């Protein structure tokens, strides 16, 4: 299989999408962060010294999605029309799951924007709570679903 990000001299390039049709694109990604009971309680009780952790993580996730083309070399800058987040608590596991959905009308997909949003949001939680628990684990960052474009629909089973 020929890689689209390499030219005939095997040099990196950004893929030319100028001939592609503009279609509705949507992608959802998720990831988990596991922590100690103490760190989990600080987040739940909103008593972190650095401020409201989950609210800050949501803002960071949105910013991460919007800035994807600046940190992932071959990503095209996209005009996003929606970035939506959700955070689920897992009390028994002392964990949070961050879910990010990104949408645009464009010539290329938004999977990387959704994945970047999740990554930056979870890293923000880590940053804000690391004084309490440096052993936190960020895991399972993955694409849940995507629609649009020639590759069609994908839903993780």
Curated annotation (Swiss-Prot):
GO MF: cyclic pyranopterin monophosphate synthase activity
Reaction(s) catalysed by this chain's protein: (8S)-3',8-cyclo-7,8-dihydroguanosine 5'-triphosphate = cyclic pyranopterin phosphate + diphosphate
InterPro entries attached to this UniProt entry: MoaC (IPR023045), MoaC_bact/euk (IPR047594), MoaC_sf (IPR036522), MoCo_biosynth_MoaA/MoaC (IPR050105), Mopterin_CF_biosynth-C_dom (IPR002820)
The EC number(s) this enzyme carries: 4.6.1.17
GO BP terms: Mo-molybdopterin cofactor biosynthetic process
Domain of life: Bacteria
Binding site for substrate: 74-76, 112-113
Pathway(s) annotated for this protein in UniProt: Cofactor biosynthesis; molybdopterin biosynthesis
Enzyme superclass (EC): lyase
Record keywords, A-Z: Lyase, Molybdenum cofactor biosynthesis
Entry-linked PANTHER family: MOLYBDOPTERIN COFACTOR SYNTHESIS PROTEIN A
Biological role stated in the UniProt entry: Catalyzes the conversion of (8S)-3',8-cyclo-7,8-dihydroguanosine 5'-triphosphate to cyclic pyranopterin monophosphate (cPMP).
Family per record: Belongs to the MoaC family.
HAMAP family recorded: MoaC_B
Name of the protein in its database record: Cyclic pyranopterin monophosphate synthase
Organism: Campylobacter jejuni subsp. jejuni serotype O:6 (strain 81116 / NCTC 11828)
């Amino acid at each position: 299989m020929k890689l689209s990000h390499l030219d005939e001299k095997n040099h990196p390039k950004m893929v030319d999408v100028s001939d592609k049709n503009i279609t509705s694109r949507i992608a959802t990604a998720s990831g988990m962060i596991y922590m100690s009971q103490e760190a989990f309680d600080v987040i739940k009780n909103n008593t972190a010294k650095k401020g409201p952790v989950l609210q800050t993580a949501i803002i960071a996730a949105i910013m991460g999605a919007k800035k994807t083309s600046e940190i992932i070399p071959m990503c095209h800058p996209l005009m996003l029309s929606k970035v939506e987040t959700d955070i689920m608590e897992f009390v028994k596991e002392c964990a949070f799951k961050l879910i990010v959905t990104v949408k645009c009308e464009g010539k290329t997909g938004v999977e990387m924007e959704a994945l970047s949003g999740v990554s930056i949001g979870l890293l923000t939680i880590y940053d804000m709570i690391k004084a309490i628990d440096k052993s936190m684990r960020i895991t399972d960052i993955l694409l849940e679903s995507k629609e649009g474009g020639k590759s069609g629909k994908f839903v993780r089973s």
